[in-house]
From Swiss-Prot:
Pfam families: NTPase_1. InterPro entries: AAA+_ATPase, Nuc-triphosphatase_THEP1, P-loop_NTPase. It comes from Methanopyrus kandleri (strain AV19 / DSM 6324 / JCM 9639 / NBRC 100938). Has nucleotide phosphatase activity towards ATP, GTP, CTP, TTP and UTP. May hydrolyze nucleoside diphosphates with lower efficiency. Keywords: ATP-binding, Hydrolase, Nucleotide-binding. The keyword Hydrolase applies. This is Nucleoside-triphosphatase THEP1. Coiled coil: none annotated. PANTHER family: CANCER-RELATED NUCLEOSIDE-TRIPHOSPHATASE.
Length: 180
């Protein structure tokens, strides 16, 4: 039975919301969940960047911000050093938690080789992982997760399925956790 879950979908459709709903229920059931997610930073109703949130420790640090130095993705400069911290968070979660969430594996996050390596190791580990991946990226690690790995169940988040999708993912992850 596949132990990895991959979510895709257009920006703003609710992929992070689905992940966080799954996390909340798993924790209510007594499971530990670690990893990262990358919410927007808004100022005056306008998106000005993104941060990284460590789900285990609760730490927050910048992923990207308008006008920042560092590798560029659109109008944002990416903080590669912080992605290396995110990679460490993922590695820690693989070793210490029941389920790992990596939201997102997208153009900004892929600027760090350490992050890419951590994603690969998380996918290869025996710990179930939920990955949010960029829908159109051709990066090898994204293509592998989105299209090629046999140990992945894939879902595309849409307006019509996003409300019940967390239940389907939970059912899959809980079944896997109970079988191991």
């Amino acid at each position: 039975m596949p132990h990895n879950v991959v979510l895709t979908g257009r920006p703003g459709i609710g992929k992070t919301t689905v992940c966080l709903k799954v996390r909340n229920v798993l924790e209510e059931e007594g499971y530990t969940v670690g990893g990262i997610y990358c919410p927007e930073i808004r100022e005056g109703g306008r998106r000005i960047g993104f941060e990284i949130v460590d789900l285990t420790e609760g730490d927050r640090y910048l992923l990207a911000r308008e006008g920042a130095s560092g590798p560029r993705v659109g109008r944002y400069g990416v903080f590669v050093d912080n992605l290396e911290r995110a990679a460490e968070s993922i590695e820690r979660a693989v070793k210490r938690t029941d389920v790992v969430i990596v939201d997102e594996v997208g153009p900004m996050e892929l600027k760090s080789n350490a992050f890419v390596d951590a994603v690969r190791r998380a996918a290869d580990a025996h710990t179930p992982a939920i990955f949010v991946v960029h829908e159109r990226s051709r990066h090898p690690v994204v293509v592998d997760l989105r299209e090629e790995r046999p140990d992945v169940v894939r879902f595309r988040v849409t307006l019509s399925n996003r409300d019940e999708l967390s239940d389907r993912i939970l059912e899959h992850v809980l079944e896997w956790l109970e079988e191991r």
